[in-house]
């Protein structure tokens, strides 16, 4: 007797719900495991699938914004999450925001009533047999986190997210910064933002008085002991940063031949060199405060923040070492991961990873090769980034045009460039869709 094809999906958040939907609509049975309400997490309040635990905004809806473009790609692939969001949208200008309770209820009802989906309300602490999508989120239960660590090695799983802000290279003033490595060791790998004593003191005063974001109840400072926020370091004394990330020694300005009073370094963040992060600037500051204070750094007066610095509880894997761009485990080919634990950041990005993982898990269950989404698409660029960026400095990332495969022609105007990237992405997804 032949066994019917099936896939296990662990977790019914945004990623797991999307994965389950994509699998079921391809005629494959789904065993969907969700531990709520039997065991709740500190962040969830209901037993509904795809519960939005923070904001009700799914961010921009226009395709000239990468967050909007990824939504449109998902619409074209019949995303349950985007369909539910469109159905339960509330006025939000150019953004897509939802009435959170009916949004989650829509997703729950569609999955619970689908003939291919069997829901199991229980906690799993080990990977089941057969094709499986693990989408247990940033608050993965300890038992399963241990299982993931055992699969990937002790260094393969992080328990907090401590990331410095990431900037668009095109927004940096290159008349004020210079390329150099400390003591000229190796290749000149850093952009350096020099500060005078007066500039440093003004920056210091703004930094120590800036507003800090509130931590959630389930977050604890102990997660961050190994990675001090820049504002905490600053409060230990006006000179402290000068012996840390703002140390000027060995970074003489080639334009003047002099050593600045302080230097903020920017490190290349992706292979295309379109993104740079501010070295050592992991922070708890509110996002608006980050923009205000960090734009005081010479050369960053008009900086565009692709991602703000964050420090929060987050279970995520060192994906460049352990995942393929199909969202498959390198250790076990019938095991897929999706959602924030893969290093994608944001509601929609999590759902998008579930969409890709779900399609590929269903293909595996049907004895078909998994597929890699084109890097010219928002979904493909996310999958490529989290599996090809530097493992040493890996931190979660949201959808942005900086991680896309560059256009063949150079377009200076930002709006025109974004439109060209969007046009190419949607043409790619339409062509790619025909192969699925």
UniProtKB/Swiss-Prot annotation:
GO biological process: tRNA methylation; tRNA wobble uridine modification
Highest taxon of source: Bacteria
Listed PROSITE patterns: GIDA_2
Keyword flag Cell membrane: no
Keywords (A to Z) from UniProt: Cytoplasm, FAD, Flavoprotein, Methyltransferase, NAD, NADP, Transferase, tRNA processing
Binding-site list for FAD: 11-16
GO cellular component: cytosol
Record carries keyword Metal-binding: no
Classification via Pfam families: GIDA
Compartments it resides in: Cytoplasm
Protein EC: 2.1.1.74
Top enzyme category: transferase
Regions annotated as coiled coil: none
Family to which this protein belongs: Belongs to the MnmG family. TrmFO subfamily.
Official protein name in the record: Methylenetetrahydrofolate--tRNA-(uracil-5-)-methyltransferase TrmFO
Annotated gene: trmFO
């Amino acid at each position: 007797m032949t066994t019917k094809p099936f896939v296990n999906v662990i977790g019914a958040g945004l990623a797991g719900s999307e994965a389950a939907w994509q699998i079921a609509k391809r005629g494959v049975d789904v065993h969907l495991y969700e531990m709520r309400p039997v065991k709740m997490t500190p962040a969830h309040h209901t037993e509904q699938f795809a519960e939005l635990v923070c904001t009700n905004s799914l961010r921009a809806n226009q395709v000239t914004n990468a967050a909007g473009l990824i939504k449109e790609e998902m619409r074209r692939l019949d995303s349950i999450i985007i369909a539910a969001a469109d159905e339960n949208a509330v006025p939000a200008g150019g953004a897509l925001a939802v009435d959170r309770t009916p949004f989650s209820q829509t997703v729950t009802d569609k999955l619970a009533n689908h003939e291919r989906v069997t829901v199991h309300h229980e906690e799993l602490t080990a990977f089941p047999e057969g094709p499986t999508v693990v989408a247990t989120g940033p608050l993965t239960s300890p038992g399963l986190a241990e299982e993931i660590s055992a699969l990937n090695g002790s260094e393969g799983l992080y328990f907090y997210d401590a990331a410095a802000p990431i900037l668009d290279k095109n927004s940096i003033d290159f008349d004020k910064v210079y390329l150099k490595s400390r003591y000229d060791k190796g290749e000149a790998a850093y952009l350096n933002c020099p500060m005078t004593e007066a500039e440093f003191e003004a920056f210091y005063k703004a930094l120590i008085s800036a507003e800090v974001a509130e931590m959630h109840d389930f977050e604890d400072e102990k997660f961050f002991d190994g990675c001090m926020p820049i504002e905490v370091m600053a409060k230990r004394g006006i000179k402290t940063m000068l012996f840390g990330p703002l140390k000027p020694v060995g970074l003489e300005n080639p334009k003047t031949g002099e050593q600045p009073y302080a230097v903020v370094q920017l490190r290349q963040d992706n292979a295309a060199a379109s993104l740079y992060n501010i070295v050592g600037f992991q922070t708890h500051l509110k996002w608006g405060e980050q923009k205000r204070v960090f734009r005081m750094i010479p050369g960053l007066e008009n900086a565009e923040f692709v991602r703000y610095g964050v420090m929060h509880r987050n279970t995520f894997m060192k994906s460049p070492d352990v995942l393929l761009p199909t969202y498959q485990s390198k250790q076990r080919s019938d095991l897929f991961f999706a959602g924030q634990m893969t290093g994608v950041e944001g509601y929609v990005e999590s759902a998008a990873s579930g969409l890709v993982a779900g399609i590929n898990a269903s293909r595996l269950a049907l004895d078909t090769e998994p597929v890699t989404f084109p890097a010219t698409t928002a979904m493909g660029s996310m999958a490529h980034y989290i599996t090809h960026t530097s493992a040493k400095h890996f931190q979660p990332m949201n959808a942005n045009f900086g991680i896309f495969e560059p256009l063949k022609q150079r377009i200076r105007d930002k709006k025109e460039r974004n439109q060209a990237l969007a046009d190419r992405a949607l043409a790619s997804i339409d062509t790619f869709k025909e192969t699925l």
